[in-house]
């Protein structure tokens, strides 16, 4: 019986994507565009949180948003109404974006004219964490109704996070959710990651996050000037 040749396609695919993501990250850095990847479950409040962030940062930064979904343009229309450039990326049934899809989106939105680009990734706590988009930061949004145990159940997502927003804190009294416990669970996965409790509905808590994000952008600009 002939031997069956086995190809580890996933490992090769991820390695190729990682290399492309590193190239894209360097291109964006040299261009002067900061790129942020937002990840979460569906319904956790990515779009509503983005609206709060945009309102606080659009006077200082030229902002663009790429909305990734399997179908529809609802989120892109919502963001465009906030007064920033927005495009919709349809993933053709895929549950994530990779570096090449990011590159296509960044070209389409005209990232060379922007200081800050947000990618609202497909709503999913599994696939998006596996693929490097070339972003400078990965920001994870976890909402109170999802429960404080999600960092234990989806470790890779929180290991990849550079910051975590805990959204819908205005609804905490309605759910069995502990802010202290969720922070402990997050830091079990990544001890140094900053956690920001927010409420997109009430507009609370975003000043601290926007201040932190502005600081990250400034650090990159200073590093680029020194290199």
Report each predicted region and the residues it spans.
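Short secondary-structure transition/capping segments
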Residues: 14, 112-119, 162-170, 213-222
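Nucleotide-state-sensitive switch-loop elements of NTP-binding domains
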Residues: 3-26, 31-39, 44, 48, ...
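Surface-exposed beta-strand edges and their flanking turn/coil or helix-capping segments
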Residues: 51, 78, 100-102, 141, ...
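Conserved strand-to-helix beginnings and helix N-cap segments that scaffold or border functional pockets
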Residues: 47, 76, 99-100, 151, ...
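A short, terminal or domain-edge coil/loop segment
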Residues: 90, 118-127, 140-150, 172-176, ...
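Conserved C-terminal guanine-recognition region of P-loop GTPase G domains, centered on the G4
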Residues: 128-135, 144-192
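Canonical P-loop GTPase G-domain recognition
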Residues: 171-227
